[in-house]
Amino acid sequence: MKILVTGGLGFIGSHTVVELQNEGFEVIAIDNLSNSSLEVLDGIERITGKKPIFENIDLREKAAVQSFFKKYSDISGVIHFAASKAVGESVENPLLYYENNINALVYVLQEITKLEKANFIFSSSCTVYGQAEVMPITENASVQPAMSPYGNTKQIGEEIITDVAKVTNMNSILLRYFNPIGAHESAEIGELPLGVPQNLVP
């Protein structure tokens, strides 16, 4: 089974690629390398014994996304991590976040819904809960107004996916996790951004 992991050389994406390959899936990783490095591919290979197929694609380029899905029309599922992710940066540069986190998502959804098997996992965020009314937060907690443009892009993304799933053959799930941190136990992959690390233990 062939699985596409967008943002596949990022922090969460690279760990997911490792787990998928260890389970026997054929993995294609897409990344535009805006906040990651090709060195991650070597780390994945040292852990699993195999490099994933890698495509250097910016998902904001619609034609590139269309070309990719024509090339790999036998994909069984997509795990979508590709996104800008820093809350503070999103406040300073909201248009970058709306372009990268929303446009790219729409372009991927437009193509995956054309496939025979449309399975989609979305990397959302605990930020969709906003200023939570009840603690601790559970999966049943209500979504509150976003506290940042980043959080808003995740809320909008969830709404888009929900709407698309209602009228297509796409199966989808939304992952709202809290502050994933730390390196792989092998220390071969971890938080290796080009800028300031966001996923380190204080």
Label every model-predicted segment:
Residues 1-77:
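N-terminal Rossmann/SDR dinucleotide-binding element
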Residues 15, 19, 111, 160:
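Rossmann-fold NAD(P)-dependent oxidoreductase module
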Residues 37, 85-87, 129-130:
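Short beta->alpha connector loops of Rossmann-like oxidoreductase domains
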Residues 76-79, 121:
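N-terminal Rossmann-like NAD(P) cofactor-binding module of classical short-chain dehydrogenase/reductase
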Residues 85-89, 111-119:
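A short helix-coil junction within the Rossmann-fold of NAD(P)-dependent oxidoreductases
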Residues 92-107, 119, 128-174, 179-181, ...:
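Catalytic helix-loop patch of NAD(P)-dependent Rossmann-fold dehydrogenases
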